[in-house]
Amino acid sequence: MEETETKRKFLEIVKEFGLQHKSVNSYEYTLPNAKPTDFLIFYNEDKDIIYCAKKLRSDYKDYINNYCDWTFGFTGIVYYKTNRARQRVIKILKQYKQHLNKIKKLEMEKDFA
């Protein structure tokens, strides 16, 4: 399959945020240090869309059942056909990366205490 603009943008985001491949057989990525069930960003080659999902609940079944079209409630799917959707994906990634950095910093401080 040829490389589309959407796929190129997706791969740029993967590189920019240092996302890690979650599944060998698909375009599923997650942030380093994140639990794979906490945050995922996907590229769907058949539909040529990018979407991401972030979990609210600890129950994985709830996570799957609570996808929605894009209510910014931190479960949801972003369809990556517009620049606004791209900006939201990047905003979520930045927020989540900050969250992970805070956790890492707290753990380091705890280790030194």
Give the positions of each predicted feature.
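Surface-exposed polar/charged interaction patches
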Residues: E16-Q20, I92-H99
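Residues that form generic nucleotide/phosphate-binding pockets
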Residues: I13, I92, M108
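Negatively charged, low-complexity tracts enriched in Asp/Glu with abundant Ser/Thr
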Residues: M1-N33
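Short amphipathic alpha-helical segments that mediate assembly, nucleic-acid/protein binding
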Residues: K7-F10, A85-V89, H99-K102
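Intrinsically disordered, low-complexity regulatory segments enriched in Ser/Thr/Pro
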Residues: K35-Q87
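Short acidic, low-complexity intrinsically disordered linear motifs used
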Residues: Q95-A113
